[in-house]
Amino acid sequence: DSTAPVPVLKILRSEETPGAAAHIAMGLNSLGLSVSLHCCVGDDREGKVIIEKLSDDGIDTSGVGVVPGRNTLTKIRFYGSRESLLDKSQILLQADRGPGEELTEGISASLTASAMSSLSDSCAIVLSDYDKGVLTTEGALSLIKAAGDAGIPVIMDPKLTGLEKSRGADAVLFEIRGLGLLQRRLMASDQAEAAKNLIETYEWGAMLVLGGVHGVTLYQADGETMHLPCSAV
């Protein structure tokens, strides 16, 4: 119905926060860790804002590539609330803008080489796959192998559709609903069996399952399982 009413939002304030790999880098930096970030942004306003905010936090951005003609992945979220309940807002709408295609072979190889150059000074590698064409299978597996040869642990947050990229990682992160979905696909009797199957298939050292209010569960390649419940702070 072309005459149907549409929501009209009054914008009271707005803020810009780096997400994805930049968010992880800022989180690690806030813990006092020295971070070497390797990713890419587009040659647009959003890309410039991300680099500026990272630099303002003291994070080295020399490994952040700017790709001409590419849009920076941007998520615009609109929150709303009643005037009497301003402290209880909820998301009304999310609009996404950004690339879905993989980087060109040359840019991808350059990004991988940039990350490789930081291995010798690293105590751990964190790979986070957002399925937006930046972390390729070849690049991820090359980094995992090089880190393994150097005795550097690799922690990875994989996409369910790209688990092959995480083969050989020391630890992978999963949301509990993601493991539940894979449990059904694998026709496993429970999540523990699904975790064991996945760990063996992809040669992971461990799988950490994030269960929200239920805490976290660590499944290890040696069969050991550890559960840590949430605690009130």
Task: Annotate each language-model stretch with its function.
Residues V66-R70, K75-S118:
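Conserved phosphate-binding/catalytic loop of the ribokinase/pfkB sugar-kinase fold
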Residues D1-L9, L85-E101, C123, F174-L181:
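Gly-rich Lys/Arg/Thr-decorated short loops/hinges at beta-loop-alpha junctions or inter-strand turns
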Residues K132-M226:
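Conserved phosphate/ATP/ADP-binding segment of small-molecule kinases
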Residues K53-G69:
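A glycine-rich helix N-cap at a beta->alpha junction
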